[in-house]
């Protein structure tokens, strides 16, 4: 099998089979899988992702489209730098070596990529364009530097964006993330929050789950900002944001974030307060705060109520108010907010009901809207009426106003690591921050770097960071932070349209190819990569790089590939190939010691539940692997890897070769009876496989093709064979299977005597008239109960159906000589005789 696969891979390469032109009279179709990080080896999860995309690409080509199906490398990132530290070598060497190996693996799987458009994000010819783009953003005030609390990953020694913190831990390292105050570069994605939110509804071909995740991440809240005066210090106020300002008369405390500026100015930091602040510093907004126990510590400060100066409220540092949402301060209304209620019970704060409810708010918060009570001038109003009225009162008093808040914050793009795109800025003591002149781009990384594992090597490089200021020509230093790697992946799909363009994009090529018609990847990128790519597209549209407003017309999120985990007697993880099953138990192949089978989980290096792709290819071939990852589960669902599954796919491919030999040896028999049912099944399969592929029901398409192969095999085994229909059916089967298993189908197609390549052929056509059955079976009921069935010819009339069914012996038995009162027909399904 490997020889056949290598043969066709060579032919495709020599014939430039999958290279496409930007100038074509055909309609375009752009299918793209998320580009991989060059970690060294392609894993089975990659194969599933790319196999899905390859079926769509090959199918749409057969449908007459000019299909763009490119591949490239998301090549910057921490793993390369960590490998450099471990091996004392430059990450560039490690990365390029991995790219070479992974490209070879991808080609060995027969994926129909246009390699002439390959991009590599760590190539200066690629990242020089994004450096220029960053400078353009800086000129438009969409890029800026400021000091801010950031998420610091102590293992990777770098800053993480909010989206890269999962349950309080770094998304790569798993380390508990702390807060640090550092100078950082940001992009003003918040300027586009409303646009990004509103246009989610236009993404009709995206999964609802992803649209919902983006909507929640942007997190639009409509409410009011208003001020509380500090008691005994009325010149100082605390500004709060609230989505329910109408509950102001139920306020019993002010909650502030642990890093609110008022703490530095006015709060005496007792040991209790300091300990609580340290504890809170590990909280990020990505933590599951709603599940965390609500806690607080009193600051010693009080504020006065804006409508009644006799009411004073304590100011409390809480673990559920965060500085990066709203103003970093809220007023707590325990009767009508669950978090506030939990804290009030814990700290013995008052709980005052201000919305009418048929429940005891001392026990549980009532969070619905209703009629206001105990609220002075708001009494008797609905929640919405009260909200408008209280905001008008804030504005009249000059203490507040209506406001809109977003959960989304500006994108922090600074990373304190070496292996990334250098940020093209210079710091001068005289001139301040100075952009690198366009003519000096790209700013490239040095080759002579010492990796000692401590921070960013660019910080202590002897010469690279030292440069003269472009403005005053005095000594200055380069910015040593590098871009977050999501910067590169936010526009790479545009570069594929013409990867040799002298500018960032070839606008004419982008106008032809964009948006991407179908983008395929994991749902884990819903609020990082996919949101950033949408943001970049909107900005690049304004900069006249592209005409589209949205990058991806359709999105498909595939499921993960899972495998059982194994541990030895010392609790060490084992690779599947180290384990053998004997009966219902598992043992170590070498030691023969008992092995414990754990949960079936996502394949990961740490748990060693990986499948070595090269070993699988040697044993079964690329086609069998492709077929298995597509046939055993719907593509959007998780897939469990199984040895029996891949073996079954290998047997099916071998069966195709056997079928070819058997059919090739058949002689035409003019006396054989035409197999109408087989002919109907051929046309039925063509129609429904096409529909299945269009709807990404690839496992269902494979099941239909297996059914057709079984029917052809059954016909071959008969004494009298309809050779013509068998040959036609087998030719169709080979064509239908080609997008799924391209190597063996091209080989069989050639052996069948065909000159043209399958990849150049149109998808088989079906004849609608051939789908009609000559006969059909109807259920025959008496008074609604099934009594018999009968097969009718399609040409039979309703009167004939009634006559035949009434005269059936089994029906006569229940009629007992009586005449039917009524006969009800459901065409081609049921006859119900009423007596």
Swiss-Prot record:
GO cellular component: cytoplasm
Subcellular location: Cytoplasm
GO biological process: leucyl-tRNA aminoacylation
Residues passing through the membrane, by range: none
Binding site for ATP: 605
Chief place of localization: cytoplasm
Enzyme class: ligase
Ranges in coiled-coil conformation: none
Known EC number: 6.1.1.4
GO MF terms held by the record: aminoacyl-tRNA deacylase activity; ATP binding; leucine-tRNA ligase activity
Keyword terms, alphabetized: Aminoacyl-tRNA synthetase, ATP-binding, Cytoplasm, Ligase, Nucleotide-binding, Protein biosynthesis
Catalytic function, reaction form: tRNA(Leu) + L-leucine + ATP = L-leucyl-tRNA(Leu) + AMP + diphosphate
PROSITE patterns: AA_TRNA_LIGASE_I
InterPro entries: aa-tRNA-synth_I_CS, aa-tRNA-synth_Ia, Leu-tRNA-ligase, Leu_tRNA-synth_edit, M/V/L/I-tRNA-synth_anticd-bd, Methionyl/Leucyl_tRNA_Synth, Rossmann-like_a/b/a_fold, tRNAsynth_Ia_anticodon-bd
Motif 'KMSKS' region per record, residues: 602-606
Motif ('HIGH' region): 36-46
Similarity annotation: Belongs to the class-I aminoacyl-tRNA synthetase family.
HAMAP family according to UniProt: Leu_tRNA_synth_B (MF_00049_B)
Protein name: Leucine--tRNA ligase
Protein's organism: Rickettsia rickettsii (strain Sheila Smith)
Primary gene name: leuS
């Amino acid at each position: 099998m490997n020889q056949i696969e290598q043969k066709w891979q060579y032919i495709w390469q020599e014939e430039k089979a999958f290279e496409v032109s930007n100038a074509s009279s055909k309609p375009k179709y752009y299918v793209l899988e998320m580009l991989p990080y060059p970690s060294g080896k392609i894993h089975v999860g990659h194969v599933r992702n790319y196999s899905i995309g390859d079926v769509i690409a090959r199918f749409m080509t057969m449908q007459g489209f000019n299909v763009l199906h490119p591949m490239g490398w998301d090549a910057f990132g921490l793993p390369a730098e960590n490998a450099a530290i471990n091996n004392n070598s430059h990450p560039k060497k490690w990365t390029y070596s991995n790219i070479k190996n992974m490209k070879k693996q991808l080609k060995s799987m027969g994926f129909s990529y246009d390699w002439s458009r390959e991009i590599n994000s760590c190539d200066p010819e690629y990242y020089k364009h994004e450096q220029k783009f960053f400078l353009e953003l800086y000129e438009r005030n969409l890029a800026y530097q400021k000091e801010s609390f950031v998420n610091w990953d102590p293992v990777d020694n770098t800053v993480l964006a909010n989206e890269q913190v999962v349950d309080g831990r770094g998304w790569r390292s798993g380390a508990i993330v702390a807060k640090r105050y550092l100078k950082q570069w940001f992009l003003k994605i918040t300027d586009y929050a409303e646009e990004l939110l509103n246009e989610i509804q236009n993404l009709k071909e995206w999964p609802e789950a992803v649209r919902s995740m983006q909507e929640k991440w942007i997190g639009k809240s409509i409410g009011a900002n208003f001020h509380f005066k500090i008691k005994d210090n009325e010149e100082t106020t605390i500004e709060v944001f609230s989505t329910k300002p109408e509950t102001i008369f139920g306020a019993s405390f002010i909650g502030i974030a642990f890093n609110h500026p008022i703490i530095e100015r006015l709060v005496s930091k007792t040991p209790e307060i300091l300990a609580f602040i340290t504890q809170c510093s590990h909280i990020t907004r990505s933590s599951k705060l709603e599940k965390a126990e609500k806690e607080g510590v009193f600051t010693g400060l009080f504020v006065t109520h804006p409508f009644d100066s006799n009411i004073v409220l304590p100011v409390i540092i809480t673990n559920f108010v965060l500085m990066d949402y709203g103003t970093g301060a809220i007023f707590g209304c325990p009767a009508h907010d669950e978090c506030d209620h939990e804290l009030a019970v814990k700290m013995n704060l008052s709980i005052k009901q201000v919305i009418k409810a048929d429940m005891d708010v001392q026990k549980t918060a009532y969070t619905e809207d209703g009629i206001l009570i105990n609220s002075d001038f708001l009494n008797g109003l609905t929640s919405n009426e009260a909200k408008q009225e209280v905001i008008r009162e804030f504005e009249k008093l000059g203490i507040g106003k209506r406001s809109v808040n977003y959960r989304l914050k500006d994108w922090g793009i600074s990373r304190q690591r070496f292996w990334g795109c250098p940020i093209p800025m210079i710091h001068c003591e005289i001139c301040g921050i100075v952009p690198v002149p366009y003519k000096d781009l790209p700013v490239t990384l040095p080759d002579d770097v010492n990796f000692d594992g401590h921070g960013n090597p660019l910080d202590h490089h002897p010469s690279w960071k030292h440069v003269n200021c472009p403005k005053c020509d005095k000594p200055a230093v380069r910015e040593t932070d590098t871009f977050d790697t999501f910067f590169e992946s936010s526009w790479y799909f545009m570069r594929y349209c013409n990867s040799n363009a002298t500018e960032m994009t070839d606008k004419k090529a982008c106008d032809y190819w964009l948006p991407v018609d179908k983008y395929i990847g994991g749902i884990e990128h819903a609020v990082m990569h996919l949101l950033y790519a949408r943001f970049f597209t909107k900005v690049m549209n304004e900069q006249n790089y592209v005409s589209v407003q949205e990058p991806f017309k359709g999105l498909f999120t595939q499921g993960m590939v899972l495998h059982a985990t194994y541990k030895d007697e010392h609790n060490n993880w084992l690779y599947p190939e180290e384990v053998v099953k004997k009966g219902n138990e598992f043992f170590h192949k070498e030691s023969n010691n008992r092995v414990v089978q754990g949960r079936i989980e996502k394949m990961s290096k740490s748990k060693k539940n990986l499948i070595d792709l090269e070993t699988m290819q040697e044993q079964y071939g690329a086609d069998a692997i492709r077929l298995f990852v597509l046939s055993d589960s719907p593509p959007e669902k998780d897939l469990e890897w199984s040895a029996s599954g891949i073996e079954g796919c290998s047997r099916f491919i071998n069966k195709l070769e056997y079928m070819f030999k058997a059919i090739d040896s058949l002689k035409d028999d003019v006396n054989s009876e035409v197999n109408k049912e087989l002919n109907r099944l051929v046309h039925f399969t063509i129609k429904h496989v096409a529909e299945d592929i269009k709807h990404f029901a690839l496992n269902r398409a494979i099941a239909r093709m297996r059914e057709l192969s079984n029917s052809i095999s059954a016909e071959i085994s008969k004494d009298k064979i309809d050779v013509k229909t068998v040959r036609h059916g087998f030719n169709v089967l080979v064509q239908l299977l080609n997008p799924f298993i391209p190597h063996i189908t091209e080989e069989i197609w050639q052996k069948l005597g065909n000159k043209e390549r399958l990849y150049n052929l149109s998808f088989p056509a079906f004849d609608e008239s051939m789908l009609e059955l000559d006969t059909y079976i109807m259920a025959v009921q008496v008074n609604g109960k099934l009594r018999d069935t009968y097969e009718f010819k399609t040409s039979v009339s309703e009167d004939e159906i009634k006559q035949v069914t009434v005269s059936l012996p089994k029906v006569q038995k229940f009629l007992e000589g009586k005449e039917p009162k009524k006969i009800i027909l459901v065409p081609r399904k049921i006859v119900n005789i009423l007596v």
